[in-house]
């Protein structure tokens, strides 16, 4: 740090003028007393253009990085809080949700919150996920226990043949035809999205439609409130770039929609014939069939 700046920090501290306005004002007066040739090119050029500024942002934050107590004083004088809850409207394009934020939807309003401020988002010490509006404790960190979630190809390879575990997913595909089941293997991102939401405590009901030779998936939630945690959102948004992902509400049911914008580039070899035989042998209960039919009617109303 330049000698003139460091000495002036001591001056500001000793005189008790440690607020951000005083810091900038004092440092600015100190910099003006330095010969023009000793100033940085950026500050000099701004003064030549007739702009008036206390000090450059680079110098200001350099000071705060060396004197943390001044940074604390600066934060205390801020009038606008850094962490806020932002109201969102439906339908919501989830790509507009900034990293580090979660989404909470309820009959009382919809908001995007900072993950570390949210009581429903998992923490390292006490990882929880939300099922509806109720937190559900998980055994260990979801990502540590499911490293495959970081890769669509790996997750699909490990789960495509687990037909019983993903019974609802495959029965919903089969409600169209076996050809649609085979078509889903060309879009591994669909099973991946369903797996991510199940891993983070949700009970998703996937409903499929076909458009331009590709499958669109709408995941329905049978809850009065829906919380999409920051980690789940980042996994979906970062690993599914070929899908437009949005959240909406229809007939008091929340829907997360996955619309393909480009064909999936990942080509994962799985035993298609064996999987299709297992899917054909699945038992579809009357309750499951009714849920799929009602879900299809709801999706058609979107």
From Swiss-Prot:
Segments traversing the membrane: none
Molecular-function GO terms, alphabetical: zinc ion binding
Zinc finger CCCH-type: from-to: 102-227
GO biological process terms on file: viral budding from nuclear membrane
Subcellular location: Host nucleus inner membrane
Post-translational modifications reported in the UniProt record: Phosphorylated at serine residues in the N-terminus. This phosphorylation regulates the localization within the inner nuclear membrane.
Domain of life, source organism: Viruses
Disulfide bond entries: none
Amino acid composition bias (Polar residues), ranges on this chain: 1-17
Main location class: host cell
One Pfam family it belongs to: Herpes_UL31
Region described as Disordered: 1-22
Cellular component aspect of the GO annotation: host cell nuclear inner membrane; membrane
Keywords attached to this entry: Host membrane, Host nucleus, Membrane, Metal-binding, Phosphoprotein, Zinc, Zinc-finger
Assembly with partners or alone: Forms a heterohexameric complex with NEC2. Interacts with capsid vertex specific component 2/CVC2; this interaction directs the capsid to the host inner nuclear membrane to initiate budding.
Family: Belongs to the herpesviridae NEC1 protein family.
Function in brief: Plays an essential role in virion nuclear egress, the first step of virion release from infected cell. Within the host nucleus, NEC1 interacts with the newly formed capsid through the vertexes and directs it to the inner nuclear membrane by associating with NEC2. Induces the budding of the capsid at the inner nuclear membrane as well as its envelopment into the perinuclear space.
Record protein name field: Nuclear egress protein 1
Origin species: Human herpesvirus 8 type P (isolate GK18)
């Amino acid at each position: 740090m330049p000698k003139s700046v460091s000495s002036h920090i001591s001056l500001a501290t000793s005189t008790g003028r440690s607020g951000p306005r005083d810091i900038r004002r004092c440092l600015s007066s100190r910099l003006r007393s330095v010969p023009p040739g000793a100033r940085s090119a950026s500050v000099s050029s701004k003064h030549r253009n007739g702009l008036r500024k206390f000090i450059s942002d680079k110098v200001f934050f350099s000071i705060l990085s060396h004197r943390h107590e001044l940074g604390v004083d600066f934060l205390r004088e801020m009038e606008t809080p850094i962490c806020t809850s932002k109201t969102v409207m439906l339908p919501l394009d989830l790509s507009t949700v900034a990293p580090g934020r979660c989404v909470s939807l309820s009959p009382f309003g919809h908001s995007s919150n900072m993950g570390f401020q949210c009581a429903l988002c998992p923490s390292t010490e006490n990882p929880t996920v939300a099922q509806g509006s109720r937190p559900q404790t998980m055994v260990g960190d979801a990502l540590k226990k499911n490293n495959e979630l970081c890769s669509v190809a790996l997750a699909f390879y490990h789960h495509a043949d687990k037909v019983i575990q993903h019974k609802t997913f495959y029965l919903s595909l089969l409600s169209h035809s076996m050809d649609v089941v085979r078509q889903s293997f060309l879009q591994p991102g669909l099973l991946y999205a369903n797996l991510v939401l199940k891993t983070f405590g949700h009970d998703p009901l996937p409903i499929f439609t076909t458009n331009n030779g590709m499958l669109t998936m709408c995941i329905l939630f049978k809850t009065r409130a829906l919380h999409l945690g920051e980690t789940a959102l980042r996994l979906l948004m970062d690993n599914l770039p070929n899908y437009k992902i949005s959240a909406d509400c229809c007939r008091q049911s929340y829907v997360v929609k996955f619309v393909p914008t480009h064909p999936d580039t990942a080509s994962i070899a799985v035993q298609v014939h064996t999987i299709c035989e297992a899917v054909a042998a699945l038992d579809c209960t009357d309750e499951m069939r009714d849920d799929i039919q009602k879900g299809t009617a709801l999706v058609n109303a979107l």
